[in-house]
Structures are given as C-alpha cells and as structure tokens.
C-alpha cells in the first residue's frame, strides 16, 4: 500500500479521539492497592464516569506495587520535598540502572512529553516525520499541530513496521522517524536485526525515536532486544520508556529518554516549564527498585494474555499475536458497533483504528474484568462467534 501523507486538517478530521485526558480509578484488586491505575478517557467519554470496566489504557491492571504505594504515602506525609532534588535523584537512579551517563538521560513528565520535545528539536520547518499506520499517534498529532508533514506507512502483512517502505520515503527533508516497538495498537514486534539495518541506512541528518513503552511485557521473543539494554551507540537514536505501563504510574506521568549527550541536550532545550511532581519522583524510584514486582507482573500478564487467546479461540475469534498487555481482536463486524455494544454494558473500549475497521484493541484487565468482557462479547448478535 502507498504511504499516506497527512495534513493537520486531515488528522483532526480523522482522529475522533481528541486530546487524551487522564483519570484515576482507585480500587483494591486481589489485595493490591491500585491507586495509581488510571484510564485515558477521550472526547465525549471524558465526561462519563459510569464505566466500571475500562479496557483502554494499556496500564498494569493490578496497579502499582505495595512498595510504590508506600513510597507515595510517605512522600505525601513529608512536610517538605524539593521537586528538583527528587527529580535529580530519580535521574541518577535511572542512569545507574541502565549504566548510562546523566548527560545521556532526559527525564520528563511522561514519554508523550518527550515525543513532543523530539518533534520540537528535530522537525524544524520543512522537515518531515515518518511513522507507521497504525501506531501511537501523539507524535503525529504534535507534528501536524506545528504544520509539519507526516508520512504514514502501513504495517507489513505480519504487522511489523515496513522498514523498506519507510526507508524509501526518507530523504534530506526527513527530520524524524518514529518506531513504537512493540507497536501500539497491534502489540507486535519489529525484529532487532531489521531495525539495526534500517538505522544504518538512514540519512545522516535523520533521527529515529524508538518507543519502548511496552518493553517489559515482551516475553522471550528471540528477535527482540532493547536499544537501551543493548545500545548501538548511534548518535541519531533516541530511546524512550515510561513508568505508566507495567509500573502502574500513569497518573504520575514520568518517562525518560536515552540518547547521546548532544542529542539529549537538544531535547532538554525544548523542555516545557512543567516540572515533575516530587511524589511522582518518589513513586518512580520505588518502582525502579521493585524489580520483583516487574518480574511478577510480566509473568502474570503472560498468563492473562494466554487466557485471552484461549477464550478467543473458544469463540473462533481471530486475534493478532501480541507481546504486550493488550490484544487486537477481530470482531468480524464493524468495530464501531462493537464499541457501542460494550458501552451499552458499561465497558469502555478504544475507538476503532484506521485500516483495522473490524478490530478492537482490548487492554488486559483483571480476571474478573475479563470474565465480564467475554460475557458481554457473547451478547452480541451471533453470540460473538465468527462464521
């Protein structure tokens, strides 16, 4: 398929989501305090608080660890916390964790803010962004808001980034390439060896953002290796991570980028005035230290994901193999109808994605939530079974 060039007007017309907002649903889930679990609600749904089950956010369904919630409680009780000092301590801890220098690290209020910083730094007037379709859209939205051209390349039949097609669109005007790996919304991987070959062929003036928001959920894939854990030391590569997903800290919005010092400096030059809340810094430090919770969450997610596949198979429903905590499920009918059906039963699903008109993306919830999901699925005409 040919690449799609998107103008700002086109994107605003096609994107029914609007601007994502964040809310919080505190709950006790299987003995784990989920105070940090938050669900994006968009457009008209932002005003609707009547969805007890919201399978939209791709956050840890079980919330942050007890160690993290204890750190947050202690921070809230503290009489004085210096935001800059706490942010510096977090930066030091992340740098130590990844064995990088402080000057190679940029910490900000969420990975989405880092993506906006990258656009501001590397998409100067006349420069173009190349991205996949579908993929996480924040970076495209911000680029179009600055009247930058966005070239959107459909995924391959295997749902990987079509790196050959992306490369064919790269020239001296390409300022930035965005790769979400694993990809959102498909949950699929683009092999590491292919990405390395792709980066090596990029124009010297083109930078690439590799978004590893779902890195921790990858479960033993032989063709996946993180560009933070196994860096290639290419000065054009920027790797982003977030504490919002497996760590369950979406409410607190902390993300970070790893890049060569000069590139990190260019990102820092476009930092917005908002700082990082000191309570959020304390929470992120506790999450970073709680490696056992991350390990247990990965294992639990793998079990929950396999159970989702099993339930889908029992209903002869097709799905896209995922390496994340969400799954694209073929509803065998217009996705808009499926979303409306679930909303009528007080379950919130994301709006449909272009080129996937019969698929719904389902964030994995708790076992009780997923049991209700499948019950409501069975209430669709035909019992939700494929024909």
Task: List each language-model region with its residue ranges.
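Active-site pre-lysine segment of PLP-dependent enzymes
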Residues: 163-170, 185-208, 212-246
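PLP-dependent aminotransferase-like
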Residues: 121-179
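PLP-dependent enzyme catalytic core of the Aspartate aminotransferase-like
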Residues: 344-345, 349, 353-387
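N-terminal "arm"/small-domain region of PLP-dependent enzymes with the aminotransferase-like
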Residues: 18, 22-81, 96, 168
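Conserved PLP-binding catalytic core of the aspartate aminotransferase-like
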Residues: 155-157, 302, 311-345
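Phosphate-binding glycine-rich loop
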Residues: 79, 89-128, 142, 146
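PLP-dependent aminotransferase class I/II
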Residues: 236-313, 317-320
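N-terminal secretory signal peptides and thylakoid transit peptides that target proteins
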Residues: 1-20
